Amino acid sequence: MKIYPDLKQVQELAEKHKANKIPIYGVIPADMLTPSVAYLKLNQGKKYSFILESVTQGESVSRYSFIGSPYRILMANGKTDPLARLERELKEVKTAPVEGLPSFSGGAVGYVSYDCIKYFEPTTEMPLEDTLGLPEAMFFMTDDLVAFDHAYQTVKIISHVCIQQGRPIEEAYEAAVFKINMLKKKLESPEIPLPEQKKVHLGYEAKSNVGEDGYKAFVSNLKEHIFNGDIFQAVPSQRIARRTDLHPFNLYRHLRTVNPSPYMFYIHCDDFDIIGASPELLVKSEHGRIINHPIAGTVPRGKTKEEDEAYAKDLLASVKDRAEHVMLVDLARNDVSRVCDLDTTSVDKLMTIEKFSHVQHLVSQVSGVLRPDKTRFDAFRSIFPAGTVSGSPKVRAIQLVYGLEKEKRGIYAGAVGRWGYEDDNMDTCIAIRTMVYKDGTVYLQAGGGIVFDSDEQDEYVETLNKLRSNVTAIEETEKLYAEEENSSA
């Protein structure tokens, strides 16, 4: 297998860019591999690992799947801004551009919980029950990863030449080549170490933390605040907990087929797992441009093409949904313009329909060119959490919803994504349609935007619609494994 770039080219890149980490890679065909199989082969027995995918049509969105594990883990302790440490770590790396690599070839993969807003807006901090007990943020620092190029049906095996004073660059290059060859050997092994799946029982009941009456009370309370002029909009949520005998990776494998989404992810964090199919980009940094995708307004998918189109037309004609959406686009413009040049901030797309497996949404795009005195982390802090999961004005809405929910949201409505070694490389989604698996229980959470004319029953049903795709994935996966057990008995 040929390695790109070669040693001489790496030496030239290191000198030209004053780099201390340079990516190199080899390429193998992907015709006998899938991302799920590659993940299993590469991460057997590892306590921490990840797979990031985009299972949608369109090369610009879904070209690559990324698989890897960390060489070091950054875990938030609940005392200081977790992004500050991540920013310091990434700044220590000076890399160089290498042709032929995907947009992400090394850096950090992880999550930022919704409750980290207290570090960016201290007035939102208040005592809250910590039901799940997860770290506030976690980042996997990764130099070695596998990128599936779905456009060309190849696999790029990536490692980094770590250049250190006193260490010959030839030695560092050979160490990186050795890692690539070890990964190649694992990928080409005929053995697929399937997850250990115990006997699956059906019929476990899902339990809400607030119930139907509790959620409707949230809506009524927030409508009073809207009527009194305290806020324009807010986003309460409910969390459901459900036992399951499924291995969490088996659940992810099925989820990616029944709910293909722009942001698919499975992150294994030792004693808990994050399984997601998010439709919504939070913030992306691309060639100096900051991009945000507000999603607000939801209707179900129809059983027929005609019914599907009727639902979409109703959504586009809904005065309530359009008003709410415009409000959140304005909030997104404000968040983006705080870190971007005002004359470059624009609404690139306004209120288009995007269809997913179980729901349809109104979607817009807001973007701007990052100011020279700002960084991608400033952009993240400005936009986080998204107005679509918090409200408007954002800080007051967060305070009011926290006062009702009285629990930490954890990963729900936070962010999952990747931050490259390059200064302008960041791609994060909102952690919605996301499940947390811990100790044999799956936790799911969903909310909806409340405005002055919201109907309590409609809003409650909307949360159920948003939960449905993941609940269905759990139920269908359980049935599949139960049927396999019965047929082999």
From Swiss-Prot:
Mg(2+) binds at residues 324, 462. It catalyses: chorismate + L-glutamine = anthranilate + pyruvate + L-glutamate + H(+). The keyword Lyase applies. GO terms for cellular component: anthranilate synthase complex; cytosol; nucleus. This is Probable anthranilate synthase component 1. Belongs to the anthranilate synthase component I family. Its cofactor is Mg(2+). It is an enzyme of class 4 (lyase). It comes from the Eukaryota. Component I catalyzes the formation of anthranilate using ammonia rather than glutamine, whereas component II provides glutamine amidotransferase activity. Keywords: Amino-acid biosynthesis, Aromatic amino acid biosynthesis, Lyase, Magnesium, Metal-binding, Phosphoprotein, Tryptophan biosynthesis. Pathway: Amino-acid biosynthesis; L-tryptophan biosynthesis; L-tryptophan from chorismate: step 1/5. Pfam families: Anth_synt_I_N (PF04715), Chorismate_bind (PF00425). Its EC number is 4.1.3.27. SUPFAM superfamilies: ADC synthase. It comes from Schizosaccharomyces pombe (strain 972 / ATCC 24843). GO terms for biological process: L-tryptophan biosynthetic process.
